[in-house]
Amino acid sequence: MPPAIVILALFTAALCAVNLRTVAADGPRIYRNEWALHVEGGTAAADRLASKHGFINKGQIGSLEDHYLFVHRRTWKRSLRSSSHRHALLQREPEVRWLQQQVVKRRVKRRVKRVYSMYPWEQRVQHSSPQVNNPAQQDNLWDPHFNDEKWDKMWYLHCDRPEFACQWSDMNVEAAWKKGYTGKGVVVSILDDGSETDHPDLAGNYDPDASSDINGGTLDPTPRYEYTNENRHGTRCAGEVAAMGNNSFCSVGVAYKASIGGVRMLDGDVTDSVEAASLGLNPQHIMIYSASWGPDDDGKTVDGPANLAQKTFQAGAENGRDKLGSIFVWASGNGGRTHDSCGCDGYTNSIYTISVSSASEQGKVPWYLEPCASTLATTYSSGAPHERKVITTDLRKGCTESHTGTSASAPMAAGILALALEANPMLTWRDMQYIVVMAANPSPLDRDTESAYPRDPRKESDFVTNGAGLRVSHNFGFGLMDAGKMVELAESWRRVPEQHVCEEDPNAQQRAITKGETIVDTKTTGGCNGTDHHVKYLEHVVVEISLDHPCRGHLSIHITSPSGTRSTLLPERQFDSSSDGLKDWAFMTTHCWGEQPEGDWILEVKDLGQQNCQRYGLRTVLPVLRKWKLILYGTAEHPLYKRDEESRPHTPQTREEPTDEEECEDGDYYDRSKQRCRHCHDSCATCHGRHSGQCLSCHEGNYFVEDEGTCSEECGQGYYKDEEERKCLDCSADCLTCQVSADHCTSCDDEDGLKLFENTCVAQCSEGRYMDENDVCQDCDDSCDTCTGPDATDCVTCADEDLLQESQCVESCSSGYFQQEYECLKCHATCASCSGSRDDQCLTCSGHLELDEDTHRCITSCEDGEYGTEEGKCEDCNIICKKCNGSQADQCLECHHDTNLYDTTCVQYCGNRRYPENGECHPCHPSCLGCIGGEINQCNQCITDYEGEDHFLYQGTCHVTCPPGLYGDTTDQVCKACAPGCIACDGPADNQCTLCEEERAPTDGRCQSEGSQTDEAECAEGCHSCEEGPDICDSCDEDYYLTEDTCVRRTNCPSFTYPDDQDRECRPCHDNCEACDGPNNQNCNSCKEGFYKTPDGCSTGCPNRYYKDDTNKECKPCDSSCFTCSGPASFHCLSCADGDFLHESSCRSTCPAGFIGNAESHECVESSCEQDQYYSSETGRCEDCPYNCRACDNDGDCAECAPTYIVVDGRCRPEETCEDGEYQDRDRDTAELSCRPCHQSCKTCSGPSDTDCDSCKGDDTILDRGECITSCGPGEYMDRREKKCKACHPTCKECSDEYDDTCTACNDGFLLTDASSCEAGCPPGQFLHHGDCDSCHRECKTCDGPHHDNCLSCQPGSYLNDQQCSTHCPEGTFEETYEDDSGETVLQCRLCHVNCKTCHGEGEEDCMECANDIKYKQDGRCVTECQEGHYPDLTNECQQCWSDCETCDGPRNDQCVTCPYNYYLVLGKCLEDCPEGYYDTMRQEKECGECHPSCATCNEGGNYNCLSCPYGSKLGEGVCYPMCEEHEYYVEKTQICEECDNSCKTCRGSTAHDCLSCEAPYGYHAMKHLCTACCEEGSPENEYCCICHESTRLCITDREAEGVQFSSADSIPTNVAYIAVATFICVVIVVLFFVVFGMLQARSNGRLCWAHKYQQVPTTRYEKMNDHVNILSQEDFYNEDSLSEDEIHSIDSTRH
């Protein structure tokens, strides 16, 4: 066949293959003949099951323990139908916990496909081999001028256009390089389509342990080469991370000395197991995984990691890098053109990945960018087609200037992370995310951003400030990654507190989604407060949503945090016409980072319905929000309070502010708003603000309360003392108080039903029991799993499969109930049967209501202002509602014009962080505390952020720092004008300037003409310190309070402020207050104009049950019978509380005579009955009132009687008149009234007994609680002026009749002093406990409680140790003796140094044994690792290395780990030159590269750089061609190939000492050419073995048994019989050889009838195509561009 036809046929086949693959990806599922299984019992159990059922076990999947991949050879490798019959039996095996047939997943590389023609600067550049630099130039000092060819064009790493001032041109990478960080020691792996291992710019950094070929099942990640260069993506990404610097070739990687690996996993079928194997490759070695791929960016796909990949992400975070956590970097996506959102990508949406976005060179939004809330940060990449792109390595050892998209951003971010990880290798995966957030720079991107692509409608910056004061964007995350800032933070970073996960119960009430309308649903959370999952400071927020919709692309979904930060979870996607909805899809947002979660989270789901949907009408899908759930990730402790001031990262918005923090002394902090150092609060040793709650550490003797940031001498209730750290730590949630540890309770909370048992708080009854009325635990009913009582059948959960309905366990739900999980819940009142509890989930209706098929509601014909009752009637809404869905005040849907809707109730005042608009309360911008609108420039009051920093109001916007010429007034948080001439100041006075015009420094706070001076003066009255001038106080004397840098008396605090006694400052009142005694609205004493005083503060309107008093400007309470009123009296009611009726502006439980109560209007309406009749609802007619009753209510109870009769219990009784000293009494049997005498001590009384006095006889008696007495009871004294008995002081048991604190006897635990007062105290040997003096433990001399063994001093001969007395000191302490002030000898135990287990002193060098976590001992000190040049021996003593080694792991010369300068490390030895089989890599680090196994000597790696060949091979243009097959060697004399020794894989001779390579599992000894066993743990000392390299299986060093000799003679048998047999076999073989050789010669000469002449095989390269041999020229044969390494191997194998 002609060659042209062959090429055409192959080309057509290739196109068909591509088309078939595309159809398969877009069409139905493709199933592989592979199954992933979770098998208990390990590899042995998996192998047994595979063999039993006809599968092959391919081994463990990545790093997932007990997860295996099975293959079935009798199943189609790729099929459109699943093969469930293959694993039906397998699934029944008890060891199989889970299995799944693997499905091909469509995964695309996130490079940008060209939309314009190729530009010149996009052309790929081919290069010759790199030049070798002079070693003298390979200096450790960083040189800003690299000699790499494209360095000058790498605009994103350095400024290459000085004429433009390079304002936004780089990511501050050079700052990290200047510190000496290059990524050295950090391992990065690129998960992609492979990576060229021998690329000139990558080979020196290539790490085989970070590489694998998952697609091909080998260890070599080299890409598959084909004519389109489709598999160039991974090589390009690798170059961005770790292209070598200063090698005169191509580009420079961000981390140009990092180790780089590649994983080939995209060039084939991608399944869940393929992804898991890639993500879990060697997680203890690889530190950073970079991925620039994901689901289709087509604007319609919703997809993410499946079961195995999700487990691998979590396992990597929990166990990778020795439990520090693997770091996963992901490209956010390139679906901008299709309006895609990375919120629909489960990889970028994961909390375990760092999702990276792109920015153009101009800092603009690229046309391909996908905005979403999960993006963490941004790096530079390509923009519009005419803009410059990223330079990096390319396929076939090339270089490109056209790498694009977020594919370029993710590896660039991975390189920056490698620099930070080199600065601090102990960073956890969460530490790294914090550092990215804190260091990200929004400034280059936070501008009026015009998109770099004309079709993209986004025109403005979308940065907002969240509730923690951080700037964040859906386009760019927290901003541009800043490498210099990241390594600076990493250097001193301390680990963030442990991660807590608060998972709220789902909102499962189904809501119909209506076209053009928005569903708003609120979830209130306390952040799991009071539990072990408490989240106080947020990191990630995940919202899991399930919904149905016929056209998913019509929906937009948002979530708003309690701080007002609004995240777009899902924007409208016009190409998404799917009717699949969302099934528990997890959206994630990072925008609430640092906020506190407590409060209302608002979910908005809107059906925009603007585009036609292709799927409408194809199948019926009702648009319904089924459920949503909130999952909060974060910390219970403040993540920044955990580190010292100098190590604490600062929030990004202050990055560009001038700072002199390093110049502040201990006890001071840097005030950013005033740009100077200020004193901490007196209680703080170090701090980050001036208040008592802003401490970072405490003075000696005090304890630090982390949650509050305060210092205290004692820990309060709910805390215990950590004496070592000097901190107050939280007790367990069950403990009321505790000691020593969080769960060592000393008391319990009785209100929670807990009791103390062996220092643990336990519930009173165990599970399955309840406490009856007699406080006895009883068994629950058999139907209950748990119950509450008072009866055994009051179930909480049910046994077996029963369902809980109204506290009873039933087999199935009754009519009018529906099943939700294991509970029967009541349907809405309008539903007879239902699918949920809402009124729009009815299936059938109750009463006379009718079902609306569209809304699934049961409706009536009620008007606005009415609602339908259960009986199908229309009744009035509550008076405060205009529209409602019930009669209650919290069931409003719309309000009257003078009130606003706040959630579901109507209020006159919306409160903080909200503003009224269109009758509703809307959230302010997150930076506002109060506002007039939702925009950033509509604030009227500013927040104080979570670091305690005030924000200041200027022209409607809240600023961290006021503009020049203004200062931040902390009293009202407003920017106010400085004095004339000041451009910066601390206050309005002319002596408060900090910077003058023309940037002159002020003199004593005043701006004066140059040369003038002011004499120094002492501080003004009341000032304790005044460093900047006598009138600028930094702190005040006692009894003075600081206000605007001035000290005043407490009573002289300015208007609108109040004295804060704790901080001794005049603090601002709430904005609504005119005068106050505290900072909150509730602390107002009087209100500003337009506000009324309420119990909750000052408000523009009054709440229900209150009315406006315009005279006193306050809200006064209505009469208790009124719900709303116009005045204080009972006859001023406007509406009544539940159950009462309004009559003539009064509220009554029953209507008066002649009126009946209207149940709908709750008013009394006139009755048609006569005056002495009432309307009976039972008979439906007018009935007569009782005898002698003139008028009665509708129940027939008398309200008015005839003359001489009175009303008694609703009936008329004869009236009886009583004299003074008598009271009226009613006979219990006859109900007749009579007069009875009062007690003799009473002057008057009112009953019902004779001692119920109203007044007393005589002056020596007083009225006390209705009784006339002459003396008071125990613990009381008589106040004769007020004629009352009053309680004595709490310490007094008895007191005199004059004063409450003039004690005559004391309560237990108190002693009576000479001054007649009672003071706490107990004699020596006792302590005060619950008011009594209890004895100390017999070993204590003195003690202080709360337990008898909390000793303060010990009896003679005992040692005091941590408040305990003992005869000897425990481990970790040493004995010390001293004399106290009284001269007595004191014995105590002192703590050893933290590194010591036992010691004889407190010094580091006084250790006798080392602590458990410290292994080594050097020069008498316990150390975590031996010093350089030393290694630990078997006793863990540090010993000196061999003299040639810099570091080592043993004493011999072949146990070096690193070498001195100018030495090479080869097989554990430090050598001056590279030995045979190795070559000089010419790197700065002086490394020997290993020659290809086919070479004897070489000048570079690879099989085409040989200089000489081993025995049995021939050299041809740098390639060594073996002349024999594997297991054979070439004999020069006979020119034939002979068999190797059985131990060899390849060899140069017949003995065991002639091996060149070995079969597994043997190791190869390169010096002795020997294959031998690798030493294992427990190998006998007399056994010969070698210590092998883990991956190459090369012998690093050997161990010879004593007396064992190895020579060629070892393999020669000495037995004569053996020699005879061997000789006979040799003769037979020789005869057979000549017979066969003769026949072949005859055939080749055509002398046999079946013979054909051989065609001579040329020594040139050939290719076989369809049985036709094409001969190529010698020149083509050695052309590098036309001959790949794989092809050379093909030639070799064919030749052999």
From Swiss-Prot:
One cellular-component annotation, GO: plasma membrane
Keyword Hydrolase on entry: yes
Biased composition (Basic and acidic residues): 643-657
Domain (Peptidase S8) ranges: 167-487
Known function: Serine endoprotease that processes various proproteins by cleavage at paired basic amino acids, recognizing the RXXX[KR]R consensus motif. Likely functions in the constitutive and regulated secretory pathways.
Domain remarks: The propeptide domain acts as an intramolecular chaperone assisting the folding of the zymogen within the endoplasmic reticulum.
Protein name: Proprotein convertase subtilisin/kexin type 5
Annotated organism of origin: Branchiostoma californiense (California lancelet)
Gene transcribed to yield this protein: PC6
